[in-house]
Amino acid sequence: MASLIDDDDGEFLIGRLLVAMPGIEDPRFERTVLYLCAHDEDAAMGLAVNRPVEGLTVFELLNRLGVRSEIQAPSDLVLLGGPLERERGFVLHTDDFSSPDSTLPVADGVALTATRDALDAMASAIKRPRKSLLALGYAGWGPGQLEQELRDNVWLICDADEGLLFDEDHEHKWTRALAKLGITADHLSATAGRA
């Protein structure tokens, strides 16, 4: 199991996955897998990567926003990135796309863009990132909040990989993240404690 901070280089959990424990008290995060885009001593920010918005595809959202798609109707589902600022869109994508002044490199091969440039790129036959997901809203923590949740065994920490992060099989991402840690939901208790 990983510690709060990577002992090798002193980095926080940027670019890692948080996997909700069974029995999480907030139903908005039940069976959720979050990708941490930012994390330092003052705050943390992440996107849920397995919570589709019911019946809303990227193509439909692009149409609503007046973004003309050059590619065959993308059937990717829009994700609910978290409970904060749900009217704001975030595109998590491979780093083969970058928008000057608005793309934030997150971790090896992954970047985040929260401007119209990313939507235009998703709709483009030429500029489209190799892999991407569109999320509305985000999850956020203030100073020490995430660290306390980790001490309280609310989340497991898992290394992210492109296959798990961008896979469209959202329903099974939680169990796949657990499997990557070498466990199943049956191994976990809905109650937390410390030995």
Swiss-Prot record:
Q: Output the superkingdom of the source species.
A: Bacteria
Any Pfam family the entry gives:
DUF179
What cellular component GO annotations does this protein have? Answer: cytosol
InterPro entries of this UniProt entry? Answer: AlgH-like
The similarity annotation says: Belongs to the UPF0301 (AlgH) family.
Q: What is the protein named?
A: UPF0301 protein CCNA_03506
